[in-house]
């Protein structure tokens, strides 16, 4: 039995990386009453101590929780370890540009966590997330079900929100996915996008006041949203923090929720040996099932192109990494 399948009454999360994303995620755990114990790890120990103290002052307004500056030894009985640590994405830099800097960091962190005796679930959010989820799986030796990336969860939320604003409907009643890489080769699954069960094209047809040209161009704003935010404020962190909190809740509460995440494919969508954004059912065991929704020919081509781009980077990055390790 994994740690994640153990004591449901005391849920323990360890966060590795107390930067903008990590601290925002910890704040979301506190305000949403998720988990009973939250440990924060970072090379900047005074920062983790300060954040833990600051967050503890909110507990009288939320719910009891143990929050503290943790060490890697504290991972041994955690249900979930969330990885946000890594080199930040700079203005003009793609997520894939980050891979060479972050692979080494990832290996050091993951092997240290595994050495602690950790036997729960890894949730990866550091970018490029699909590649670092794959490397976490490789370096940990864990089953694929217990290594999950945030994938296109935030991209899909941005997509739903953008559609909602255009058609003037609550985003919670818009159902739509962005699949593929969390990055430049991601793509919208328009063929399954719907508002309250009505296919998006039917909705537009029935509501002539909806700007069709704006609908067509909507995805590009979604795809490039991170670059826009980074240019304006230096980093994105609130959206992904809440996405991570949602994933955490689904895992710890054994929800069997369907979310678009970076998951390992074994034949689904015609892909193998890759972590990439796809819908999956998740619960306390991790990934219960990858859902293969039927794509149009054009969408399938985009999935294949996205997977090919990721695999090319993975192969190049790992070859370089292994060569450096062998020196």
Swiss-Prot record:
Pathway: Fermentation; pyruvate fermentation to lactate; (S)-lactate from pyruvate: step 1/1. It holds the Pfam family Ldh_1_N. One of its GO terms (molecular function) is L-lactate dehydrogenase activity. The modification Phosphotyrosine is found at residue 227. It is an enzyme of class 1 (oxidoreductase). It comes from the Bacteria. Homotetramer. This is L-lactate dehydrogenase 1. It comes from Enterococcus faecalis (strain ATCC 700802 / V583). The gene is ldh1.
